[in-house]
Amino acid sequence: MQALRHVVCALSGGVDSAVAALLLRRRGYQVTGVFMKNWDSLDEHGVCTADKDCEDAYRVCQILDIPFHQVSYVKEYWNDVFSDFLNEYEKGRTPNPDIVCNKHIKFSCFFHYAVDNLGADAIATGHYARTSLEDEEVFEQKHVKKPEGLFRNRFEVRNAVKLLQAADSFKDQTFFLSQVSQDALRRTIFPLGGLTKEFVKKIAAENRLHHVLQKKESMGMCFIGKRNFEHFLLQYLQPRPGHFISIEDNKVLGTHKGWFLYTLGQRANIGGLREPWYVVEKDSVKGDVFVAPRTDHPALYRDLLRTSRVHWIAEEPPAALVRDKMMECHFRFRHQMALVPCVLTLNQDGTVWVTAVQAVRALATGQFAVFYKGDECLGSGKILRLGPSAYTLQKGQRRAGMATESPSDSPEDGPGLSPLL
């Protein structure tokens, strides 16, 4: 008689992971629940939300009659996620710690803990996503050391597991999973991948999981909670006062506490001005923030960017991109934004240029460009450089022309790319 398959499910104390564990139990698996504590702090009201979430996760395990474990990754989170978050802001970029957390904590630290310490056959999370494997195929996966050297042994090459969008397109979370390793993905089950949020809530209500059903959905960065973002950031970074300057006439409109506090597209809080102004560019040398009137100002729109070396879910770039050096696909740089048609151009160093079919609003360095082909999430790369804005192109500004023609730019930098922040 075959032993029960052991699935270790990450529990956050929310409804999605609770229902994921319930569904795994219903499928007849031996399920263990694990709560990860990644941040050690009180919010501004003196409440440690992690403790409450841990209690809720423990109660889920009691209701489902499954073992409960708690692990602390506070140190790993600080080193791999939060330090990166601060470093990116100091550089004037706009990081996405959720993507980095999934890569380093949930699908690395937790994955290895589940497999090595708890003897898991597979892990599971409450993410709305799917893979190209059925459950039984997941259980057949074993760790295979990546072939080394120039030539791969043809018998060691495996078909890559695909990361696919969830059935509920509005709740789809493949954006946040776009940096997950192939090794972890092929041993992961996403029980909610084919369900809608409403149906998940219905399942929770019918199975005595009311305590997680009534909780508000967590949004934003887990370590900030309900706190004011500017106040939070200034606890860790030194204020660097500078000016708000109009992109249209270089007029000084006000002052700010630090250019790193603002991201492109964000409304600038400038005292004394009736009309809203929006951040369109930042000067890292002088510490000035350039702003423009109107939310649809052409200075907010760009159609060209360059990424860091892309993390491909399949571990290799798509065959068409390798063959032709160019490929049509779609991308997004914010969760739930509409997919944007684009053309990728592959560079020798593994980075890509992304040319959007039409200019998009509020691109910012530090964000991740996540690529899609149909339902499949191909992977992602961090945005490191931006092309000129529509406003710059319209004006034909001399400084943009000088940046493009700078002898220090390598040919790899592409047309009109500059390291705008």
Curated annotation (Swiss-Prot):
Positions of the catalytic residues: 101 (nucleophile), 222 (cysteine persulfide intermediate)
Highest rank taxon of the organism: Eukaryota
Intrachain disulfide bonds: 101-222
Effect of residue 10 to S: Acts as a disease modifier in patients with aminoglycoside-induced deafness and a mutation in mitochondrial 12S rRNA; affects tRNA processing by decreasing thiolation and increasing aminoacylation of tRNAs; the mutant has lower thermal stability than wild-type; does not affect import in the mitochondria
InterPro entries: MnmA-like, MnmA-like_C, MnmA-like_central, MnmA-like_central_sf, Rossmann-like_a/b/a_fold
Catalytic activity: 5-taurinomethyluridine(34) in tRNA + S-sulfanyl-L-cysteinyl-[protein] + AH2 + ATP = 5-taurinomethyl-2-thiouridine(34) in tRNA + L-cysteinyl-[protein] + A + AMP + diphosphate + H(+)
Any one GO cellular component localisation term in the record: mitochondrion
Localization, UniProt: Mitochondrion
EC number: 2.8.1.14
Region Interaction with target base in tRNA, annotated ranges: 96-98
Keyword match Mitochondrion: yes
Tissue and organ distribution: Ubiquitous. Abundantly expressed in tissues with high metabolic rates including heart, liver, kidney, and brain.
Residues reported in the UniProt entry to bind ATP: 10-17, 36, 126
Pfam families reported for this sequence: tRNA_Me_trans (PF03054), tRNA_Me_trans_C (PF20258), tRNA_Me_trans_M (PF20259)
Region (Interaction with tRNA): 171-173, 334-335
Keywords tagged on the record: ATP-binding, Deafness, Disease variant, Disulfide bond, Mitochondrion, Non-syndromic deafness, Nucleotide-binding, RNA-binding, Transferase, tRNA processing, tRNA-binding
Ranges where the record places region Disordered: 395-421
GO MF term list: ATP binding; tRNA binding; tRNA-5-taurinomethyluridine 2-sulfurtransferase
Family per record: Belongs to the MnmA/TRMU family.
Any further remark recorded for this protein: During the reaction, ATP is used to activate the C2 atom of U34 by adenylation. After this, the persulfide sulfur on the catalytic cysteine is transferred to the C2 atom of the wobble base (U34) of mitochondrial tRNA(Lys), tRNA(Glu) and tRNA(Gln). The reaction probably involves hydrogen sulfide that is generated from the persulfide intermediate and that acts as a nucleophile towards the activated C2 atom on U34. Subsequently, a transient disulfide bond is formed between the two active site cysteine residues.
Protein name listed in UniProt: Mitochondrial tRNA-specific 2-thiouridylase 1
Gene this chain is encoded by: TRMU
